[in-house]
Amino acid sequence: ITHTKTTESFYALADGAADLLLVYAPEASALEYAEDRGVELLMQPITRDALVFLVNADNPVTSLSQEEAVGIYSGKITNWSEVGGEDRPIVAYQRVEASGSQVMMRAQVMKDVEMVDAPTELRPGEMGELIDRVASYKNTANAIGYSVYYYVTEMYLREGVKLLAIDGVQPSNETIASGEYPYCQDVYAVIRADEPEDSPARILFDYLQTEEGRDLIEAAGYVRLVEE
């Protein structure tokens, strides 16, 4: 299994280098890439995740408003004292462009507000590296970063960090499933529409939408998608 960034994964699917994706919603450019090549895609939500903000465990701040999160990443808020914390400069980590979490950050948090440019040293290439840096940045509580809920809580558990509530709502399986936590996003299974009915990719795509498939997804630690 080759892991690539979300946008690059869609390129691979459109080019026939991949048969099935389990991914977050892509940038519009990824869908346009497939359309330009005459490739129709089938996207089916199978679970739900969320963008979460993490800080050093010693940081006294426990919650940000949505406006404060935008303020930090637009460069308008630069000190923790402006959001109820100590008088310390905020060191705001970002993800690399084309990563799923960066796409989510721009679409769900920043929306039409431009993100402040971050130097290369504040853009770790991998999510695990970002978490490590937030946990250990000069042994202080200055740092903040963002990742996705499943990765932080299931794949890369790390002492020294904590998740922030947003508007007083702590991210959890329950608040993400219900949509109460504001930065939720579905995770999709994606195949090409012309994938043969008896191919392994099509069979798995269909299986993940069954009750047994949903049970398996939940047993793996993912948030169960609530049927409308």
Please place each PLM-identified region on the residue numbering.
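Exported/periplasmic ABC-transporter solute-binding proteins
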Residues: 1-35, 39-228
